[in-house]
Amino acid sequence: MEYIYASLLLHSAKKEISEDALKNVLTAAGISVDEVRLKAVVAALKEVNIDEVLKNAAAMPVAVAAQPQATQAQPAAEEKKEEKKEEEKKGPSEEEIASGLASLFG
């Protein structure tokens, strides 16, 4: 994310988004720079019209936050899933295992 933020900072300052410029911004922010990621971001952004992306992002509808009641129902559903998993994990009883072993010894 830092690489994108640094790129947006350079873009808003009307500076070229180059490897050196991006590296300088990240270093100034105290972030250790990964050269591979740096090159990938610069290469990817060369093909992107950042102004167009920002305009489209501003026009996108924002998702409505979930209702508090829905979060209360989730733990109950999770507990049911856990109970089902426990039932499935039980497997054969000790008696079934013992009878299986007894058949091995005649």
From Swiss-Prot:
Keyword Ribosomal protein: yes
A Gene Ontology biological process term: translational elongation
GO molecular function: structural constituent of ribosome
A single GO cellular-component term on record: ribonucleoprotein complex
Keywords carried by this UniProt record: Ribonucleoprotein, Ribosomal protein
Disordered, as annotated region: 66-106
Xref: CDD domains: Ribosomal_L12p (cd05832)
Residue ranges, compositional bias (Low complexity): 66-76
Bias kind Basic and acidic residues: ranges: 77-93
PANTHER family noted in UniProt: 60S ACIDIC RIBOSOMAL PROTEIN P1, LARGE RIBOSOMAL SUBUNIT PROTEIN P1
Subunit relationships: Part of the 50S ribosomal subunit. Homodimer, it forms part of the ribosomal stalk which helps the ribosome interact with GTP-bound translation factors. Forms a heptameric uL10/P0(P1)2(P1)2(P1)2 complex, where uL10/P0 forms an elongated spine to which the P1 dimers bind in a sequential fashion.
Protein family: Belongs to the eukaryotic ribosomal protein P1/P2 family.
NCBIfam families (alphabetical): ribo_P1_arch (TIGR03685)
Function: Forms part of the ribosomal stalk, playing a central role in the interaction of the ribosome with GTP-bound translation factors.
Protein name: Large ribosomal subunit protein P1
Provenance organism: Saccharolobus solfataricus (strain ATCC 35092 / DSM 1617 / JCM 11322 / P2) (Sulfolobus solfataricus)
Lineage per the UniProt record: Archaea, Thermoproteota, Thermoprotei, Sulfolobales, Sulfolobaceae
